[in-house]
Amino acid sequence: MKAINIALDGPAAAGKSTIAKRVASELSMIYVDTGAMYRALTYKYLKLNKTEDFAKLVDQTTLDLTYKADKGQCVILDNEDVTDFLRNNDVTQHVSYVASKEPVRSFAVKKQKELAAEKGIVMDGRDIGTVVLPDADLKVYMIASVEERAERRYKDNQLRGIESNFEDLKRDIEARDQYDMNREISPLRKADDAVTLDTTGKTIEEVTDEILAMVSQIK
């Protein structure tokens, strides 16, 4: 198969990262978690007491992705591995706000485009098919019900030892959907040439197989 790029977009907790990792593994491609980039910048924003000088924040930031056999993708922020801090509730509650800021978006998109230049990339996020990789060979827009997405996030938090309330997670996801879809810069939307894939009630294996079947049709 020729080298291709795959873009997976969709709202929070639609299963993008889980599926992107699995697809990348099955196809021996490189997985790039763009959400982790925005989470890392949000982590720094919180460490800086919620600074509003986002241009200065990114100007004084180094951000790299590395891969370790035992952890997979790791996020190195200012020479520190911050991977284990990126899923805490405080970061989750602020990431949409930070990611909506133009300096932050420009900084991250530039890095994402650089990573995908050689192809062979599976990338997931909110604006991959519309902004980062508009020429991706396959674009999939993943959706799921709010209830299922909240349940996934709740179980994920449990595994990570993060305390959370199911109803609060539902409200947070609904609020984040509205924010992501209505922000001025790179709003969440389906690319015109993307395939919609509803993952509600489906297993990881079922969704992965559906995407692999789409890949097999690429000439």
Curated annotation (Swiss-Prot):
ATP binds at G10, P11, A12, A13, A14, G15, K16, S17, T18. This is Cytidylate kinase. HAMAP family: Cytidyl_kinase_type1 (MF_00238). Belongs to the cytidylate kinase family. Type 1 subfamily. One of its GO terms (biological process) is nucleobase-containing small molecule interconversion. SUPFAM superfamilies: P-loop containing nucleoside triphosphate hydrolases. It comes from the Bacteria. InterPro entries: Cytidylate_kin, Cytidylate_kinase_dom, P-loop_NTPase. GO terms for cellular component: cytosol. Keywords: ATP-binding, Cytoplasm, Kinase, Nucleotide-binding, Transferase. It comes from Staphylococcus aureus (strain MRSA252). It holds the Pfam family Cytidylate_kin. One of its GO terms (molecular function) is dCMP kinase activity. It is found in: Cytoplasm. Its EC number is 2.7.4.25. It catalyses: CMP + ATP = CDP + ADP; dCMP + ATP = dCDP + ADP.
